[in-house]
Structure formats: structure tokens, C-alpha cells
């Protein structure tokens, strides 16, 4: 082996070792207790190097270290790069930390990036009920009705967990409440699947009431029969049967139609400008 080739290989190995130490330092796995992120980068650690499935920036978002995220971005970390799971850094940050989300968006992170299952960061923020991340993503242009591989929207993901805060914000931004996924489920039916487990909380009940106001009318029965899992709970079954049997009133159907006609925007601002009495504005905003 020539001396020049040996030097090149040694240089590559040294950079790889530094980059691995960078990942470990960010994750607080201190194999080298005196390491710090800035010194490792200054010494030649590659801020975009992948170790296994991890990249440094993804790791910083996993541990919710907004200062480290900003430092890595300043040093050239690629904000929309994919890790070994085909996820961007924003997918990780959206689950956990608004500060990281804000920094990433400031540096050009794509709020509509898709992972391997076509999930967006907004899907994950809604699922984890990280309401401030939901709001930050929507304010930065995230698609409120983005579809994953199963044609579920962020609203569906929030509803299946009974995440009242996230559901409320998504509805404020015009989320479609009657969307149907590939196996016939709607956001409200996803929430019902949670309620039938018998572990419903007051917040989940409030989430159901909010979705019911937004949808106007819904149907869970097939050929006039409630799903078996609903029928097992007589009290819930009776309540849902009454709601499904009642046709949507003109008032509730008009509310749904008006909200939909306003399009994908922040509805509280849009409704504020309508020439309507205050009571009707509150009705349109699902406040009664």
C-alpha cells in the first residue's frame, strides 16, 4: 500500500471515529467524557455522517436539544436529510419539542416531508398531542389534510388517541372531519374505537363532543347494526345509536358546509370577518 493511500484511509477512519464520538456525545453516551460537540466538529467530525440508522442532527432532535440542533445546522447539517428509517429530523422533533421544531423550520425544514409510511411531521405531532408543535407546523404551511399510506390524516391520528388539544387546533385550521381512510374509518370512528375499550376519560368524551359538532352527522352502523365491539357496551351503544339515528339538522349541516367553504385557513380569523352575529360566529367555531 502506498503512503498516500495509507494516509487517505487513516484520514477517513479518523473522521469516522470523530463522527461516531459526535453521535455518542449528543446522546450523552460519554465513551470519551471530555468530548463536546463543538470541539469534535472543529476536529473534523462529519455533521452529516450516518452511523447505523442515526445522523447527528436526528439524534439531537431525539434528545430535544435545541441548542445542539442549531449548532449542527450552523455547521452545515442537512436539515431535510433522511435517516436509516427514512425520517427527517422534523419527524422526531414534532413528537417532542417545540423549540427544536422552531429552529428546524427557521433553517428550511420541509413541514410536509414524508417518511417511509408517508407520515408527515404533523401526523406525529398530532399523535403525540404536542399541541404547540401542531400549531407551529400549521403556521409554517403543513398540510392539515395530508394522507398517510392508509389515507389517514393528522386529525385521524389525533382522534384515535383522544387528543383533545390537537384535535381542536386541527379543526381550527380547517381539517376535514369526514375524511374516510382505506378501510372505511373516519376520525370519529377512530375515537369510538378508543371509547369502547372502557377507559374513556373526560377529555376523550370532550373530544368526541367536539368531533360530533364538527361533523354534523355520522354513521357507525352497517345494515342497521352497530359494530360488535360497540354492542358489548350497552350504555355507549345506546348513546351512539341515538346519535346515528338522528338526522343532521339543517343548522348542523349548514355549519359543516360553511366551515368547509372557508377553505384551508385559520378559521377563527376567517369567521371573525364574517358579517354575522357573535352567537353564530361562536356556533361556526364549534364553541356551542
UniProtKB/Swiss-Prot annotation:
Subcellular localization, as worded in the UniProt entry: Cytoplasm
SOCS box domain segment(s): 235-288
Claim: Cytoplasm is one of the keywords in the record: yes
Alphabetical UniProt keywords: ANK repeat, Cytoplasm, Phosphoprotein, Repeat, Ubl conjugation pathway
Modification after translation (UniProt): Phosphorylated by TBK1.
InterPro entries in alphabetical order: Ankyrin_rpt (IPR002110), Ankyrin_rpt-contain_sf (IPR036770), ASB8_SOCS (IPR037332), SOCS_box (IPR001496), SOCS_box-like_dom_sf (IPR036036)
ANK repeat segments: 52-81, 85-113, 117-146, 150-179
Database matches in SMART domains: ANK, SOCS_box
GO cellular component, as recorded: cytoplasm
GO biological process, one term: protein ubiquitination
Pathway: Protein modification; protein ubiquitination
Top-level taxon: Eukaryota
Sequence positions bearing Phosphoserine: 17
Subunit: Interacts with TBK1; this interaction promotes TBK1 proteasomal degradation.
Comment text on domains: The SOCS box domain mediates the interaction with the Elongin BC complex, an adapter module in different E3 ubiquitin-protein ligase complexes.
Family the UniProt entry places it in: Belongs to the ankyrin SOCS box (ASB) family.
Stated role: May be a substrate-recognition component of a SCF-like ECS (Elongin-Cullin-SOCS-box protein) E3 ubiquitin-protein ligase complex which mediates the ubiquitination and subsequent proteasomal degradation of target proteins. Inhibits IFN-beta production through the IRF3 signaling pathway by targeting TBK1 via 'Lys-48'-linked ubiquitination, leading to its proteasomal degradation.
Protein name: Ankyrin repeat and SOCS box protein 8
Species, as recorded: Macaca fascicularis (Crab-eating macaque)
Gene expressing this chain: ASB8
